[in-house]
Design a protein with these regions (language model features):
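A generic secondary-structure signal
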Residues: 46, 63, 93-94, 184-191
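Generic alpha-helix structural propensity
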Residues: 39, 52-55, 68, 72, ...
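A residue-level signal for conserved active-site and pocket-lining positions in enzyme catalytic cores
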Residues: 60, 148, 391
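Single, function-defining residue in the core of a domain
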Residues: 1-33, 119, 155-487
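Short glycine/proline-enriched coil/turn segments at helix->beta-strand junctions
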Residues: 53, 101, 220-223
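Active-site-proximal, Lys/Arg-enriched surface segment
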Residues: 47, 76-156, 161, 165-166, ...
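Gly/serine-rich nucleotide phosphate-binding loop at the start of the catalytic core
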Residues: 2-78
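Short, basic, glycine/proline-bearing loop/turn elements
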Residues: 74-80, 197-200
Length: 487
């Protein structure tokens, strides 16, 4: 990126370099806003300079430094334009969290912008929301967004969001995630964050992803996928050699390993234990070259020829304790590396534990930055607002070394390098005064005529259904299920 050179020339001191990086990113962000740029830029600053959590979008027009009215706020989101490919490059050019081994850890997850009452908003899907009780989850209409973020070492509430894509009614979540990870990996390589010869990038996922299919789609990339599995899964070992003289095709599946049946667990290839502060002593076991049986009735329906055998490393974690007095159950992970040694197994499961840091980022987006606060009708406007939130969070990452600890009297002091995102946001207004603001002041204008007094709206917005568009495969599977239930 062009702005990366300016950050190096910003000065000799650490504070000067950090201020130069922040100013350069803000300038590049402004150039990514191709329509309503001034208002969109000031809107992002208002999110960061607000005294408390963002509750109402129009209330950002009252934040000091915002020079336009509340009508301009919604007009910018509805009629503005954001050069998303260029903004992706700007966000990816920011230095990633550094690990001691220099290896990059990424996390992919889906977070929903719930819109249950927005009947006039198109492209809403049913999003799963966890309840407090057991089996209390609900399916609520909303816009699901797939995020990819870089993780940092140690317990931290910081991540580095790199990309987001809204899932539509016609999208296959696995294919969208694969394309998203492929694009992020290529962008990191072109930006110099990953170079040929470096160790493979680790991507951690939750159990909602089809990690087997993802590993097959991304087999040509220097990437290791590590995902949590549900406790009812069954995996197979490599097949044993056929006895001499026995005909027929070669075997594809060996002895099954059922997660719910310990009697089927063969001797693991890797065993060990590690001490953690949160989970106590964790017992680790790993089986190499384990694969799952694939079926043509699922997403592999249109796969040409024989279904592939995607081998990986199966990892079992047995913690000594869990937060919240929950029942102790083993956690199962599957990594796309077929034969991981003890060191690689430890790196993989410890990287997966850092996946929960992205939950802090989602909570900060919603509860503090007001990601889901606007009542927007157009999903394109929601996409613009989402990228503004990511750009605002990136500015907090760059401003972390510069922000003062403006703590409340009952809060503990924090060092500049360890402040939380909420604490950095509290001091961002003072940091903003030390860097340039490329947004131009508003020009004087007169209000428009508006709707004539006493007239009613004659063009009502259309109503839209919720959910994915049905396919022939889904209908055929539904018929088969009904036939089996009938007898």
């Amino acid at each position: 990126m062009a702005w990366r050179g300016s950050e190096v020339e910003a000065g000799a001191g650490d504070a000067s370099r950090a201020r130069g990086r922040l100013a350069a990113f803000r300038g590049e962000l402004y150039r990514c806003l191709t329509a309503r740029a001034d208002e969109l830029f000031e809107l992002g600053d208002a999110v960061l300079c607000s005294d408390g959590p963002v509750r109402v979008l129009a209330g950002l027009s009252l934040v000091p430094g915002h020079r336009r009215g509340h009508g301009a706020v919604y007009d910018a989101l509805n009629a503005g334009r954001v050069d998303v490919p260029r903004l992706r490059w700007a966000v990816g050019a920011v230095p990633l969290p550094a690990w001691p081994d220099g290896r990059i850890r990424l996390a992919a997850d889906v977070c929903a912008w719930l819109r249950p009452e927005a009947r006039t908003s198109p492209e809403r899907l049913f999003c799963h929301v966890h309840g407090r009780g057991r089996n209390a989850g609900q399916m609520i209409p909303g816009w699901p967004y797939s995020f990819v973020a870089a993780l940092g070492p140690g317990a931290s509430s910081w991540t580095a969001p790199l990309d987001t894509v809204r899932l539509g009614p016609d999208d296959d979540a696995t294919q969208v995630t694969a394309a998203q990870l492929r694009e992020v990996a290529g962008r990191l390589e072109r930006a110099g964050a990953w170079r040929p010869g470096d160790r493979d990038i680790i991507v951690v996922l939750d159990c909602g992803y089809d990690v087997i299919r993802l590993a097959w789609l991304l087999a040509d990339l220097p990437m290791v996928l590590c995902a949590r599995l549900r406790s009812n899964r069954v995996f197979c070992a490599p097949p044993a050699p056929k006895p001499p003289g026995m005909g027929g095709p070669p075997r594809q599946h060996g002895a099954p390993l059922r997660f719910a049946d310990p009697a089927t667990w063969a001797a693991p290839a890797v065993t060990g234990q590690a001490s953690t502060a949160r989970y106590g002593t964790v017992q680790v076991a790993a089986w190499n070259r384990m694969h799952a049986r694939l079926c043509k009735d699922t997403a592999w329906e249109h796969h040409p020829g024989t279904l592939p055998v995607v081998e990986g490393t199966l990892i079992q974690l047995r913690p000594a304790r869990l937060p919240g007095y929950r029942e102790l159950k083993p956690m199962w992970l599957w990594a796309s590396g077929p034969a991981a040694g003890p060191g690689e197994v430890a790196v993989l499961w410890q990287a997966f534990l850092r996946r929960f840091d992205i939950e802090h980022t989602f909570r900060f987006f919603k509860q503090v930055l007001g990601w889901t606060a606007p009542l927007l009708r157009d999903p394109a406007a929601a996409d613009r607002w989402t990228w503004l939130i990511i750009a605002a969070y990136t500015q907090l990452r760059l401003a972390a070394p510069l922000a003062a600890d403006l703590r409340l009297p009952w809060q503990r002091p924090q060092d500049p390098g360890t402040m939380t995102p909420a604490r950095v946001r509290r001091g961002f207004r003072a940091v903003r005064e030390t860097v340039a603001t490329p947004a131009a002041p508003p020009r004087p204008c007169k209000p428009g005529p508006g709707r004539p007094k006493g007239s009613k709206n004659q063009h009502k917005a259309p109503r839209h259904d919720v959910g994915k568009h049905t396919t022939k495969r889904w209908k055929r599977t539904k018929r088969r299920t009904r036939a089996k239930q009938a007898g």
